[in-house]
A protein has these predicted regions:
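Sensor-1/coupling segment of RecA-like P-loop NTPase cores
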Residues: 153-162, 168-174, 178-213
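Winged-helix-like regulatory helical subdomains adjacent to P-loop NTPase cores
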Residues: 262-346
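A short, basic N-terminal segment
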Residues: 1-43, 63-66, 188, 380, ...
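P-loop NTPase nucleotide-binding core
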Residues: 39-175, 195, 347
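A short helix-turn-beta junction within AAA+ P-loop NTPase domains corresponding to the substrate/partner-engaging
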Residues: 210-227
Length: 396
């Protein structure tokens, strides 16, 4: 009986299954080592949804903490909208990750009596200073971090702070202006500042930061994550199935690789669905095709807005969407799609475009020109392509 899946959809990949990204890891470590020389380093890790940003950050944190003796912490900022909450979560994460270390007593005074145990049996902790003290931390953030680096000198080489899921509060100018002021203060007042910040966000978040504070982007070393190549995808699937003593037929492996399209989000969703569908120790193409349909349904339910999900799956427009979904493409020209439609589908195509626009699934692509549309969320064409691919294979 199967006890666990080696695949982790929606979560960072386990370190033992991490593949590819060698050049990016080398680049990140180069900046990390520069921070140990007393220089503030700022990296913006950019990539589309499901491309593996958090996995790469988690790998970096593990090696810098365990192998390079950094004080490292990974701060998840979903739902954060204020600078007070941002700074509170940073210090709370430092406390949670390191309060059981011997050296932590050197900085424990900074947390005072503002740490509370919560939950059953006090298994979780929160850092909750009064709002006025949080405001002071926001205003004196560089000094607070510098004091920590001074206290742990000799025990830790530098601070490594990952700010993950920054999409929410970057829509306002507050963060961009505050972070620019933070970096400027360090440049002028701190000769030594061994701190390495990694911000993680979508490409459009970089654009938003630039609009709010045009000079901010020159501060960051931008690292962009691209899709994995086929060899890396194959390596990942082999590692994952080997870990649970399962084999995979060559044609099944080829199909999984093709439909994963180099995207970790698809690799994990397809892999997990295939794993649970298989009843024998060898994965066949039959398992894979069943897994693709399951994975498409999972992605639709997990990542798409319910109204969008229902609209995309409606029989009225499904045939059109399947023709759009013959390839993963973020944009399309309406005449290219019209040429693929039969007479009945062509009659409703205008209504289709109007309805998809009303739901916020597509918008007119002004930059491309007249007749061009693009998907608002890059997961939409992924889902449509995957569902379309599964439908075709089911018909065979």
């Amino acid at each position: 009986m199967k006890e666990y899946s080696p695949f982790t959809p929606g979560n960072p990949v386990p370190l033992e299954f991490f593949v590819g990204r060698e050049k990016l890891v080398t680049e990140i470590f180069r900046y990390a080592h520069q921070s140990t020389r007393g220089r503030l380093e700022n990296v913006f890790l950019s990539g589309d949804r499901g491309i593996g940003k958090s996995s790469l950050a988690s790998l970096s944190r593990f090696f810098l903490q365990e192998k390079e003796n950094f004080l490292a912490t990974h701060v998840f900022l979903g739902g954060t909208e204020t600078l007070n909450e941002l700074v509170r979560r940073i210090f709370e994460a430092i406390y949670k990750d390191h309060n059981n270390k011997n050296w932590f007593k050197k900085i424990s005074d900074y947390f005072g009596n503002h740490v509370n145990k919560v939950g059953f049996f006090g298994i979780d902790v929160t850092f909750n200073p009064p709002e006025e003290k949080l405001a002071q931390l926001v205003n004196h953030f560089p000094q607070a971090l510098y004091n920590i680096t001074e206290k742990i000198k000799g025990d830790k080489k530098a601070l490594f702070i990952i700010l993950d899921d920054i999409n929410g509060f970057c829509k306002k100018p507050d963060f961009a202006n505050w972070y620019k002021s933070f970096v400027d203060y360090v440049a002028v007042h701190q000769l030594e500042f061994p701190v390495f910040f990694m911000l993680i966000g979508l490409p459009e978040i970089r654009d938003a930061l630039s609009e709010h504070q045009p000079s901010l982007l020159r501060i960051f070393r931008v690292i962009e994550i691209e899709k994995l190549n086929n060899d890396e995808v194959i390596q990942f699937f082999n590692k994952a199935f080997d870990s649970v003593q399962m084999k995979i037929d060559s044609d099944a492996l080829q199909t999984m690789t093709e439909y994963s399209n180099g995207l970790p989000i698809l690799m994990h969703e397809i892999g997990d669905a295939v794993f649970w569908d298989a009843t024998a120790n060898t994965i066949t193409n039959k398992n894979v095709l069943a897994g693709i349909l399951q994975a498409a349904d999972r992605i639709g339910k997990k990542y798409l807005d319910p109204k969008v999900y229902r609209a995309i799956r409606s029989e009225r427009y499904r045939a059109i969407l399947r023709k759009i979904g013959e390839a993963i493409q973020p944009e399309f020209h309406k005449h290219d799609i019209l040429d693929k439609l039969n007479e009945t589908e062509q009659k409703v195509f205008g209504n289709f475009l109007k309805r998809m626009t009303e739901l916020g699934i597509i918008i007119k692509d002004i930059e491309k020109g007249r007749g061009y549309y693009k998907f608002v969320n890059k997961l939409y064409p992924i889902y449509i392509w995957l569902e379309s691919a599964g439908f075709k294979d089911k018909k065979k």
